[in-house]
Each structure stands twice: as structure tokens, then as C-alpha cells.
Amino acid sequence: MGRLDGKVIILTAAAQGIGQAAALAFAREGAKVIATDINESKLQELEKYPGIQTRVLDVTKKKQIDQFANEVERLDVLFNVAGFVHHGTVLDCEEKDWDFSMNLNVRSMYLMIKAFLPKMLAQKSGNIINMSSVASSVKGVVNRCVYSTTKAAVIGLTKSVAADFIQQGIRCNCVCPGTVDTPSLQERIQARGNPEEARNDFLKRQKTGRFATAEEIAMLCVYLASDESAYVTGNPVIIDGGWSL
């Protein structure tokens, strides 16, 4: 018996990183996983794993989300993962950067929740997990102005949904990781003028002396998706290797 046997789980940004690790972990625990991403070629790599079906989805497009929701009969868990990390202070953040970050990091979650929550309410049970970050209202982080703003908004969204629908059997939590070794992190390191220095800068802020793995984050997500966490709702769950201490 798996910890997620019989559960239908939809997640976004499943083609790589935390999303991919979570999709694989969910499937190993017996869930039926519907993995979505905008990157069709990388998403297809998941199709070889039992229990996972894939669907191309741009989470910034309301029409696509609504069409997808109409195709889904039921779901038990919605995991909103998609996001973008902008590097810089408020002075480095142009309006287009601000708008893009807000659109992908916050509005996409609003659209997904609004589309799929009615199905959960109809079945009188549901579980929503949102990807936030320690770089949010949890901790002020240098050069993460718009990113931290969006992730603080995700915490607010999470608490609001949890409070509004707790009596209808809905749970909503968010995951707040520290620095995770993902393709996204490696891209950000390589984009800096001195990648080795950039990597060391990222490592310095982790008191454990290492990055988290995507698989470590995924195992927390398995717990939040399972009935083991039935009494947990409205919480920003921190997994940061002591960064916020």
C-alpha cells in the first residue's frame, strides 16, 4: 500500500526540478498523477513512468486552464509549482519583470485554484499545495525583491484559501524551501559573471553547508499530499536547512 493510493494529483511545472521529483514521488506512492508543464519535450520524459500522464499547459493562460479543468472529472490534490526567480533589488526590477513574476508566480496559482476548487467542493474534500519560499515574508533576502514579494503573496493566498474553505473539507498549505539544487538554480549560477563565486554565495547562506535536493522537497510534498497531514492546513511549511534561523 502506498501513502497516496487512489489519489488523483495534478501538478504544474512537472518537467524538471521540484515538480518532476514530486511527480515521481507521488506516482511511487500510488497516486494517479497528471503532470503539466509548458515544455512538451521535457514533459514527455515522464510518460515512461507508471501512474503518470502528461498534459501541456501554460499556467498563465486562463483559457487553457479552464479547458483543462473541464477535462478532469475529479482530483484530490492540486500542487501549484510553477514559478520564476528574478535576481535584483527593486531598482533592478523593470515593470516587465514585475508583471511577469506576478503573473507566473501568483496569478497562475489563483487561476488554477479558481478552476479546480469547485470540483473539490463538490466532493466535499480537497487538498491544495502551493510552492512558496523562505525568501518571502519568512525572511528578507538580498536581490530577491519581486520574487520575495510574490512568494509572500503565495503565503497570503494559502492562508486565505485555508480559512475560507476549512469547513467544506478543503486543506491548503504551502512549501517554503531554502536553496534547492535544481536546473533553475544551475541556470542562475551560470548566468552570473563568476559562476564559481555565485555558487559559493548560494552555499554560504545554507547553514548545513549544502543545497537541498529536489527529492527532499518532494518527500515533504508527499506528506502534505497524504492523509498523514490531515490536521495540517493554512501553514507555510519551512524546509530550508536552517537558513531562516
UniProtKB/Swiss-Prot annotation:
Chief subcellular location equals: cytoplasm
Cross-referenced InterPro entries: NAD(P)-bd_dom_sf, Sc_DH/Rdtase_CS, SDR_fam, SDR_superfamily_enzyme
Q: What quaternary structure, including any partners, is listed in this protein's UniProt entry?
A: Homotetramer.
- Tissues showing expression: Detected in liver (at protein level).
Q: What is its EC number?
A: 1.1.1.-, 1.1.1.30, 1.1.1.104
- Which residues does the annotation say bind NAD(+)? 16-18, 37, 58, 151, 180-184
Q: Which sites are catalytic?
A: 147 (proton acceptor)
Which keywords, in A-to-Z order, does the entry hold? Cytoplasm, Lipid metabolism, NAD, Oxidoreductase
Its function, per the record, reads: NAD(H)-dependent dehydrogenase/reductase with a preference for cyclic substrates. Catalyzes stereoselective conversion of 4-oxo-L-proline to cis-4-hydroxy-L-proline, likely a detoxification mechanism for ketoprolines. Mediates the formation of 2,5-dihydroxybenzoate (2,5-DHBA), a siderophore that chelates free cytoplasmic iron and associates with LCN2, thereby regulating iron transport and homeostasis while protecting cells against free radical-induced oxidative stress.
Show the PROSITE patterns listed in the entry: ADH_SHORT (PS00061)
Please write the reaction equations for the catalytic activity of this protein.
Answer: cis-4-hydroxy-L-proline + NAD(+) = 4-oxo-L-proline + NADH + H(+); (R)-3-hydroxybutanoate + NAD(+) = acetoacetate + NADH + H(+)
Task: Tell me what turns on expression of this protein.
Answer: Induced by low iron levels, and down-regulated by elevated iron levels.
Question: Where does the chain cross the membrane?
Answer: none
| Pfam families for the chain | adh_short_C2
Its GO biological process terms?
epithelial cell differentiation; fatty acid beta-oxidation; heme metabolic process; siderophore biosynthetic process
Pathway, per record: Amino-acid metabolism; Siderophore biosynthesis
In its UniProt entry, what is this protein called?
Answer: Dehydrogenase/reductase SDR family member 6
Residues reported to bind substrate: 144, 188, 205
Q: State the GO CC annotations.
A: cytoplasm; cytosol; extracellular exosome
Provide the protein's localization.
Cytoplasm
Q: How does activity depend on pH?
A: Optimum pH is 7.5-9.0 with (R)-3-hydroxybutanoate and 6.5-7.0 with 4-oxo-L-proline.
What taxonomic lineage is listed for the species of origin? Eukaryota, Metazoa, Chordata, Craniata, Vertebrata
GO function terms (MF aspect): 3-hydroxybutyrate dehydrogenase activity; 4-oxoproline reductase activity; NAD binding; oxidoreductase activity, acting on the CH-CH group of donors, NAD or NADP as acceptor
- UniProt family annotation: Belongs to the short-chain dehydrogenases/reductases (SDR) family.
